[in-house]
Amino acid sequence: MKWKEFIINQTKQDYLRNIIQKVNTIENHQVVYPLKKQRFRCFNFFDIEQTKVVILGQDPYHTPKMANGLCFSVDLGNNLPGSLVNIFKALEYDLQIKRTNPDLSDWAKQGVLLLNTVLTVNAHQANSHKDFGYDQLIKNAFIELKKQKHVVYLLWGKQAMSYIDLIDKDHNLILCAPHPSPLSAHRGFLTCKHFSACNDYLIKHFRTPIKW
């Protein structure tokens, strides 16, 4: 099944219809990010069976022109947010790759699910939609993923780690680290070497590694 089919099926369920309706109502008087057409963008790139890596973020960037529907990613031409700066620092420390392109869609095209735990946010109000019920969507996505083997889960931060019990630990790789936010990255994220560990695992299980 394609991830696109999954999200279409979810939008037919009451919980997600209620969330969408609530967000639409807020948009009558408040700017919401990302743009409506980008809110389920992370599900547009590949089939569920093609999922190699899951990176679980928190909520979208709440400043203008930043959130683009892929966790941690921003479009070309924007300044790099602090979290993305630290992700690139960790990548360089690990694999000596000096990445400058902030648009992570090339990762998504290789089977990396760049999923936030909350898919919308009010402008300039971090975590403003955290209690809207998106956790049900994340749980349902993880239930679908349980049918897959040899997927690498990169869980950065406590919010991402809260979903660890939904993962089949016997047939997948789980890598945990502090969130890449400037507030916490120095606690071990910058030297976690998750990118090489991820690719080593994929190669071991005869899957194509990610070109980070």
From Swiss-Prot:
- Which keywords, in A-to-Z order, does the entry hold? Cytoplasm, DNA damage, DNA repair, Hydrolase
| Family matches, as SUPFAM superfamilies | Uracil-DNA glycosylase-like
What Gene3D superfamilies does the annotation carry?
A: Uracil-DNA glycosylase-like domain
Q: Record's Gene Ontology CC terms?
A: cytoplasm
Write out the catalytic residues in the record.
D59 (proton acceptor)
Pfam families, A to Z: UDG
Primary location recorded for the protein, binned into one broad class = cytoplasm
Which Gene Ontology MF annotations are present? uracil DNA N-glycosylase activity
UniProt keyword annotation of DNA repair present:
yes
**Biological process annotations from GO:** base-excision repair, AP site formation via deaminated base removal
Under InterPro entries, the record lists: UDG_fam1 (IPR002043), Ura-DNA_Glyclase_AS (IPR018085), Uracil-DNA_glycosylase-like (IPR005122), Uracil-DNA_glycosylase-like_sf (IPR036895)
Q: Which PROSITE patterns match?
A: U_DNA_GLYCOSYLASE
According to its UniProt record, which reaction does this protein catalyse?
Hydrolyzes single-stranded DNA or mismatched double-stranded DNA and polynucleotides, releasing free uracil
Name the residues that span the membrane: none
Which family does the UniProt entry place this protein in? Belongs to the uracil-DNA glycosylase (UDG) superfamily. UNG family.
Per the entry, what this protein does is: Excises uracil residues from the DNA which can arise as a result of misincorporation of dUMP residues by DNA polymerase or due to deamination of cytosine.
Please state what the protein is called: Uracil-DNA glycosylase
Source species of the chain: Ureaplasma urealyticum serovar 10 (strain ATCC 33699 / Western)
